[in-house]
């Protein structure tokens, strides 16, 4: 029995290596090519910094990058949670009252088409310069639309045979929602989260370019570029990449836990 468990564990481990391996190999090859290009063509730091210099600046400024990441990450997390809750709530409303979808959807599309910098500029004028609210509101809006579209699709695009079977047993609309629509929408929710999680970091990051406190990753990148410290700026970009990767990884872990819960 223990031998079978060991074999099963080995197979799963090998499967994970096969999934991650190509990405790791590609990443290492890309960094090696980047480093070689900078050294081979003698590119100046103000044009393109070498990965070795970026890594050096990353560890040299680690505490500052961490502080900036907590600010940007905090704004992204607040917006992600609020946007997800609002998106789920509105998707339930739209699935119950279909006529509202015809009214809300065009407005949502129009609002989502407005460039980030325009909305951030308007929000910055509405609040004090020391407020983090504009950035969090911007993240909330981006996440809200992603979650709304996906979850609403999961709630409405169910098999008609399942709904008809429930109705043949005189099931209420709430029972149909709980037994059919919600289980069907769960995969759509996690698909939305895997998109919204890194998008929340990107939005918080970009929002910092257009005013407000100069304490996040985007602001630090701008200030370092202005002072011709390109390697340091790239180090903050690396911090932003790691932050986005962390958010995405958490969304995958949550999906895995949900699947294990369903299996039980």
Please annotate each region the language model reported:
Residues 14-40:
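N-terminal signal-anchor transmembrane alpha helix
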Residues 192-242, 249:
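Non-cytoplasmic
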